[in-house]
Regions:
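Structural alpha/beta surface segment adjacent to cysteine/selenocysteine redox centers
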Residues: 11, 15-117
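Amphipathic repeat-derived elements
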Residues: 1-5, 55-57
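C-terminal cap of thioredoxin/glutaredoxin-like
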Residues: 3-6, 11-32, 100, 104, ...
Length: 200
């Protein structure tokens, strides 16, 4: 069985959202699975001094234009959220709690959270919003509400973020295939070719 592709993303990352609509199908063409791994860009920014794209003069305006253009090309619904960026510890904690019980459901939750934020302009940062979205995809409401207050669930996310940083992950989306890193949704075609050829 071929190694899975690790897909690192932040729920507040629009390019992560775009990549999330393509990565599973791309991997399947090569007989690969995908491990979805939300992390927190805020933790990375504290280390390397980056700031969100939207807040960078000139680059922010271009990014908004590029995102809309890229979404049209991919035929993916997209609207830059009115509240952007947001903190995403809560949806990320929910993801890992669900993932530890039912990985396939966790992936559906991630897709629903991304769609709510970047297609429907819904702020997903609060426990109430996250739980409402999770309930719609089949997650038990009461259990998730309780889990989000559990220190062990918070520690689980912290461990994932630390592990991602230790691995060199600094952006979203960020992919690792057979030890080879690729950063950015614009590297998916390169990743596809890497899998097709075995690398170069």
């Amino acid at each position: 069985m071929a190694n899975p592709i690790d897909f690192y993303f932040d729920f507040s990352s629009p390019y992560g959202y775009l990549a999330s609509t393509r990565i599973d199908a791309l991997a399947a063409r090569h007989g690969r699975s995908v491990v979805w791994r939300p992390h927190l860009l805020g933790a990375v920014f504290k280390i390397n001094g980056q700031q969100p794209l939207a807040s960078i003069p000139l680059k922010g305006n271009y990014t908004a234009h590029d995102l809309a253009r890229s979404a049209r090309l991919l035929k993916v619904p997209f609207k830059l959220p009115s509240k952007f960026p947001i903190g995403t510890p809560t949806p990320s904690r929910a993801f890992y709690w669900v993932h530890d019980r039912e990985p396939a459901l966790a992936k559906r939750l991630a897709q629903a959270l991304y769609s709510a934020y970047f297609a429907q302009d819904r702020d997903i940062s609060s426990p109430e919003a996250t739980v409402a979205i999770a309930t719609k995809v089949g997650v038990d409401k009461a259990e998730l509400e309780q889990a989000l207050n559990d220190p062990a669930v918070k520690d689980r996310l912290r461990a994932e973020v630390d592990a991602a940083i230790a691995r060199g992950v600094f952006g979203s989306p960020y992919f690792v295939v057979d030890g080879e890193p690729f950063w950015g949704s614009d590297r998916l075609d390169q990743l596809d070719k890497w899998l097709e050829t075995g690398g170069w």
